[in-house]
Amino acid sequence: MQKQHQRQHKVELVANLKSQFADAKALLICDYKGLSVRKLEALRNKARNQGIKVQVIKNTLAHIAMKETGYSDLDLKETNVFLWGDDQIALSKLVFDFQKEHKDHFVLKAGLFDKESVSVAHVEAVSKLPSKEELMGMLLSVWTAPARYFVTGLDNLRKAKEEN
């Protein structure tokens, strides 16, 4: 009875992971060997505030969930923590900022963006991009610049005519 309950729990966990992995735009796998529980909880709290999920998953269960989701086959060995979410930039920034603070105990091992394997260097490059909100602000600034310059020009023309 106990083993049957454990098996059912594992099946439910894999189904849940499969669903969440399928919906995620980004998935990063990190080695957390030697990281204290307190520090891992701090990472979870930062991630939760950004809508990012963090979970330590048994490699065999993660492998099954990833395979059934269609993610490329990854070599899952040793201790792994999985981080996933919809914002690739926010997830990359979170991982690399945390990795800077905990160099010896937290290392990015693999990454998947839109179900495609990406290198650690690619994830690092993405982490250096402006956030989604900053990019939208830049774009809005570019869009409104012509109107701003036009209004400024009209105002300068009005002031010049008033002086004459």
Curated annotation (Swiss-Prot):
CDD domains linked to this entry: Ribosomal_L10
Gene Ontology CC, one term: large ribosomal subunit
Keyword rRNA-binding: yes
Keyword terms, alphabetized: Ribonucleoprotein, Ribosomal protein, RNA-binding, rRNA-binding
One Pfam family cited in the UniProt record for this chain: Ribosomal_L10
Signal peptide (UniProt feature, chain positions): none
Biological process according to GO: translation
InterPro entries, alphabetized: Ribosomal_uL10, Ribosomal_uL10-like_sf, Ribosomal_uL10_bac, Ribosomal_uL10_bac_type, Ribosomal_uL10_CS_bac
GO MF entries: large ribosomal subunit rRNA binding; structural constituent of ribosome
Presence of the UniProt keyword 4Fe-4S in the record: no
Subunit field text: Part of the ribosomal stalk of the 50S ribosomal subunit. The N-terminus interacts with L11 and the large rRNA to form the base of the stalk. The C-terminus forms an elongated spine to which L12 dimers bind in a sequential fashion forming a multimeric L10(L12)X complex.
Family: Belongs to the universal ribosomal protein uL10 family.
Primary role: Forms part of the ribosomal stalk, playing a central role in the interaction of the ribosome with GTP-bound translation factors.
Protein name as catalogued: Large ribosomal subunit protein uL10
